[in-house]
Amino acid sequence: MNRKQLQQKHELWEANIANWEFYIRSYLGGNDYKNGYYLNRYILESPEEYDARVKHTPVDNHCKNVVQIYTSFLWRVPPTRDYGDLDGDESLLSFLDDADLDGRNFNTVMREVQMNASIYGNCWVIVDKPQTVTKTRAEELAQDIRPYISILTPENVVDWNYARASSGRFYLDYLVVIEDINAERAIVKVFTEELI
């Protein structure tokens, strides 16, 4: 894959990135919001006057409060789930206890998904399982090899494609994610049906 393909953006990403940046800055508030320069300019206002007005405008963070109130309401009563035949399964219990392989349980991860969806209007959730050379299910259980969740915010998922299976269903066959970017480098992951 060449540099041009890696820099390509999905048309929906291009259409929404300014909104997503506004939403997260509104949620974070403070200097993040001020630095977005979202105040409307007055018709005859000079750039210096506008900068001074932005600098002296108080930024009360009501967006964060609203998201947190809704989140606390939704998660006040823990969800109940029916796992059917999987109830009590070792790998399921391990997943529920550490859903993201960073020590956070499933409810905590899903609470973050809900908060991101409240901020951005959507978010991406990837469920993956490490590739291994184990030969049996018992070996996987012994090594705690199991699925895990990764949460991606929409500004980091820059390109994707859905294909139609022979059954008629759509499935994701291509995904480009920016994991980290700074002045010196960018870490970009490309997911296809064949490889990551």
PLM regions and their residue ranges:
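Extended, helix-rich architectural segments
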Residues: 1-160, 164-166
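Intrinsic disorder/low-complexity signal
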Residues: 81-84, 172, 178, 192-193
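Short, hydrophobic/aromatic-rich segments at coil-to-beta transitions
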Residues: 109-111, 169-176
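Structured loops at beta-to-helix junctions and adjacent beta-edge loops in soluble globular domains
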Residues: 128, 178-180
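Helix-boundary and N-terminal cytosolic regulatory elements
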Residues: 164-167, 171, 181-183
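Long, internal scaffold/assembly segments composed of regular secondary structure
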Residues: 185-196
